[in-house]
Structures are given as structure tokens and as C-alpha cells.
Amino acid sequence: MAEKNERPIKVVAENRKARFNYAIEDTVEAGIALTGTEVKSVRNGKTTIAESYADSRGGEIWLINANIPEYLQANRFNHEPKRPRKLLLHRKQINKLMGAVERQGMTLIPLKLYFNEKGRAKLLLALAKGKQLHDKRETEKKRDWSKEKGRLMRAKG
């Protein structure tokens, strides 16, 4: 039997500040509807999702403010870099996410943009609640203490 040519997961863009600025409750993988030039530009790896978020419009979830720069080799057929992009989710997932956003005051933020094994662009979307300044300080103290604890254990052990 022939071997399948499976590609590893390739992370293209990551929102590193999200875990510091938000308390993440749940994550869901969503497909993202892109044009041809957008896919080529994303594969180049210049995409930023740090300032982006997801919002509901007309019963669908859209990715707002994600910057996918223009593809240099596509002259007049290029796309708009910050246009809203539709996220592909099941109806039950959309209802669950939008219910949490409306009732509990949560936010939908992207964590990662990557290509899966089949070469499809996917977005790891998080249902999160914004942290206050004192929560951020507490998280930083816990992280520093765990680092210090590791150093002490290595020094004594």
C-alpha cells in the first residue's frame, strides 16, 4: 500500500499576548474562508492576528482586523489586507459561542493560524474573558515563582 504524504502542522501566526491578556475558557478549531492570493500570502508567513478578534454578523462568525498582507506576485487580482474573513463552524458551535459572548460577556480571540495535515488553513479560536490589571500581575507572580522553584530544585537536587 502506498504511503500517504502527510504534512506536519505548520503554525503561521500566533497570538502570544492572548494568554496573558485573557483568561481562556474554551478553544475551538475553525476553518477560514480565504481567496487564492490570501492563501499564498499566509503561506509566506507574514500574517498577524495579534490585534484581531471574532464577531457575529448575520448568524455567522467573522474574523475582524486580521492582517494578511498583499501577495506581491498577484498584481491586480490582490485582496484587501484587513478585510473581514468568514470562519467556518458548525451551527451548534456558532450558537454555543455566541450564547457565551452575549450572556457572559466573553470575547472570541484567535490564538493560532495554521495549516493542518491536509493543507487547509485553520484558526484556533478561544472563548475568553479579559483580565484586569491585578489578575495579570498575579499570573506574572505565579509564573516567576514556578521558574524560581525550578531553579531551586535543580540547584539542590
Curated annotation (Swiss-Prot):
In terms of one coarse class, where is the protein primarily found?
Answer: cytoplasm
Where on the tree of life does the source sit, at the highest rank? Bacteria
Q: Which GO terms describe its molecular function?
A: RNA binding
Q: What are the entry keywords?
A: Cytoplasm, RNA-binding
Q: Where is this region: Disordered?
A: 134-157
Is Cytoplasm set as a keyword in this record?
Answer: yes
| Compartments, record wording | Cytoplasm
Which InterPro entries does the UniProt entry name for this protein? SmpB, SsrA-bd_prot, SsrA-bd_prot_CS
GO BP annotations, alphabetical order? trans-translation
Compositional bias, Basic and acidic residues, is annotated for 134-151
Gene Ontology cellular-component terms for this entry are: cytosol
What is stated as this protein's family in its record? Belongs to the SmpB family.
Q: What does this protein do?
A: Required for rescue of stalled ribosomes mediated by trans-translation. Binds to transfer-messenger RNA (tmRNA), required for stable association of tmRNA with ribosomes. tmRNA and SmpB together mimic tRNA shape, replacing the anticodon stem-loop with SmpB. tmRNA is encoded by the ssrA gene; the 2 termini fold to resemble tRNA(Ala) and it encodes a 'tag peptide', a short internal open reading frame. During trans-translation Ala-aminoacylated tmRNA acts like a tRNA, entering the A-site of stalled ribosomes, displacing the stalled mRNA.
Q: What is this protein called?
A: SsrA-binding protein
Species for this entry:
Rhodopseudomonas palustris (strain BisA53)
